[in-house]
């Protein structure tokens, strides 16, 4: 390994260390709570070193949004994609999302729920990045439902966009109430609601949705 390669590798490790902390801070306190000085102090790094990695507070925020999206994909989207297209994949996607929130992958619950509340009325690159993440997620839920309909496991007259909206609303409400009240009852209610909506849309070709305990 050359000296340059070693510096690049160390820089990448430091960047991941910093981003591991920024997603935690932002999920609880918001993206505006991120500062180079705070991160340098908490992680025992030099301010100049942290600044060199990101260049500005805005780039630090954008990198944090990208890292949160990467983690979300790894924990929710990718595992759900391992289930064959159909009602089972729709159910698994929702289950994984609820577990991602309930298990506090990010200590403040769903990272993007908080980021949307923080940046919904603002303008600029960070707002736009949060919007893209939200649209990508909604589109993925719709696509998963559409695949189930194409596979013959959901009724042909299923309003895909409406069903996706309702499932996302149930998941996000469970997240919000759980974080606010520090309890998990809302997750069961969300699972009951999701199961009911998916069963209502399913055809006889679909595997049965498990009963919610």
Task: Specify the residue positions occupied by each region the protein language model found.
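Hydrophobic alpha-helical connector segments
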Residues: 63, 77-108, 160-167, 209
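Short hydrophobic/aromatic patch on the recognition helix
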Residues: 43-54
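C-terminal peripheral helix-coil segments that are non-catalytic and often amphipathic
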Residues: 1-5, 92-99, 135-151, 170, ...
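Basic, helix-initiating cap at the start of DNA-binding domains
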Residues: 1-29, 33-42, 59-62
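Alpha-helical DNA-contacting segments of helix-turn-helix folds
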Residues: 54, 59-68
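Amphipathic alpha-helical segments used for helix-helix packing
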Residues: 89, 104-125
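Hydrophobic alpha-helical segments that form the core
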Residues: 108, 113, 140, 156-177, ...
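All-alpha amphipathic helical-bundle segments outside canonical DNA-binding/catalytic cores
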Residues: 88, 128-133, 150-166, 185, ...
């Amino acid at each position: 390994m050359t000296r340059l390669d070693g510096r690049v590798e160390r820089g990448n490790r430091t960047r991941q260390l910093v981003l591991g902390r920024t997603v935690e801070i932002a999920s609880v306190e918001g993206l505006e709570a991120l500062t180079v000085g705070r991160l340098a102090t908490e992680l025992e790094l030099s301010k100049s070193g942290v600044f060199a990695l990101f260049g500005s507070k805005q780039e630090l925020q954008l990198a944090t949004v990208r890292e949160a999206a990467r983690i979300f994909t790894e924990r929710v989207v990718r595992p759900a994609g391992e289930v064959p297209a159909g009602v089972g994949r729709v159910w698994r996607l929702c289950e994984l999302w609820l577990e991602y929130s309930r298990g506090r992958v990010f200590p403040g619950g769903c990272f993007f729920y908080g980021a949307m509340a923080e940046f919904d009325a603002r303008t600029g690159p960070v707002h736009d990045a949060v919007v893209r993440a939200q649209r990508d997620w909604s589109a993925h839920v719709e696509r998963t439902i559409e695949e189930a309909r194409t596979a013959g496991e959901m009724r042909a007259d299923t309003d895909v966009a409406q069903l996706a909206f309702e499932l996302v609303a149930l998941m996000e409400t469970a997240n919000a109430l759980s974080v606010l009240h520090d309890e998990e009852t809302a997750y069961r209610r969300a699972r009951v609601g999701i199961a009911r909506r998916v069963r209502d849309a399913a055809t006889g070709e679909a595997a049965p949705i498990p009963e919610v305990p």
